[in-house]
Amino acid sequence: MXXXXGYLEFDGARQQSFLYPLFFREYIYVLAYDHRLNRLNRNRSIFVENVDSDKKYSSLIVKRLILRMYEQNCLIFSIKDLNQNTSLGHTNLFYYQMISVLFAVIVEIPFSLRLGSSFEGKQLKKSYNLQSIHSIFPFLEDKLTHFNYVLDVLIPYPIHLEILVQTLRYRVKDASSLHFFRFCLYESCNWKNFDIKKTSILNPRFFLFLYNSHVCEYESIFFVLRKRSSHLRSTSYKVLFERILFYVKIQHFFKVFVNNFPAILGLLKDPFLHYVRYHGKCILATKDTPLLMNKWKYYFVNLWQCYFSVWFQPQKVNINQLSKDNFEFMGYLSSLRLNPLVVRSQMLENSFLIDNVRIKLYSKIPISSIIGSLAKDKFCNVLGHPISKATWADSSDSDILNRFVRICRNISHYYSGSSKKKNLYRIKYILRLCCVKTLARKHKSTVRAFLKRLGSGLLEEFLTGEDQVLSLIFPRSYYASKRLYRVRIWYLDILSLNDLVNHE
């Protein structure tokens, strides 16, 4: 992104105010569809292949689109003429797909520059990969053992499109780009109403940017409340309607409050407060009392309802006591458990026992939800009994086996940090038996006869696939392999989670 910023010659004054002219530059389309910017997107770029017309694309399409954008009202058309309006073989729908991808890349540039400048001069921990999803769990293991409560929050998403536009308005100062963005956003909703069976009209990167900008706005306000929690304990959020005057009002309130009540500033301030977000969910861990946790709960409710105009029910915010309740986060059920430890001490001729209690974070596999996902994808029934995968029976034997091995390996790696492996063994058993039943169905045989004919070597991939990775951590020996089933291992190369079938 730094090389792209230098190529575009952005400076501090221009990076937010002159984005709209980039829509008419051919080189920005090359940047938008570069494979490095789309490396995390499983959907192929529409520059490579269009699923609607099965045609290859080149820079000529970009020139045609730019010429059409120069024409007045070239992109405005009725819904009835959606598929009939074509330009040299390409529909207006396809051009809107290109614009949506381009808009996401252009508006990401100032955000990326701001994010990069915020990390300058800061020392980041190098003990583990910060990009990995599993890097969150060592952090939780170190911090949550000192806390009492966790606030489990389901982040709401605005149902009205204008809220998204208004949220973006405070970060992107280019009015022309915002008007163009509003037009594309409303047109995309019209397309969805026109044909609900269509696949995603706009690129997923476009909607991912909208969600990130929405959450970024929410977190910017939340962090202000976090730093000034002692001052805002009785303030109504109705005074925070206008984002432009938000910080002015807050600073004035702080100044008055400090002058009038200098003796009680630190009474309710909580320095031990940690915030973690993943996808549409976040947790707030603290050592507060139940009263203060309820105050934080209604802070969130009032923030979403009064400032973001989103109906947010208090039931979506759960207060979990770590010593008693489990909280679900990132596919794990986590809780704190007390492990008693007895130490025998010898002093001269006297000996005595010392009882110690160690707090440990336990992470369990939610077996019921995973079995539900496997049943939804036809790997088993709702009770967890393996069934044959009928849709894969037409594939080759090696393809079927490789698919099951890949799914089993992905699940094993992600849930390798579980405190107890019993549920993980059950999931592996379901996948292995489902694989055998699928192969037996393809060859029109029974499971017993199929295994008897091919022998036990068929399932060696399931047994050795994980050892090849774990052998890089532990030496190959009987005691080491036995230890692998007891220790918790967090793989620090897991960057994203996809569905079980398509994950590669």
Swiss-Prot record:
It is found in: Plastid, Chloroplast. GO terms for molecular function: RNA binding. The keyword Hydrolase does not apply. Pfam families: Intron_maturas2, MatK_N. GO terms for biological process: mRNA processing; RNA splicing; tRNA processing. GO terms for cellular component: chloroplast. Keywords: Chloroplast, mRNA processing, Plastid, RNA-binding, tRNA processing. Belongs to the intron maturase 2 family. MatK subfamily. Usually encoded in the trnK tRNA gene intron. Probably assists in splicing its own and other chloroplast group II introns. This is Maturase K. The gene is matK.
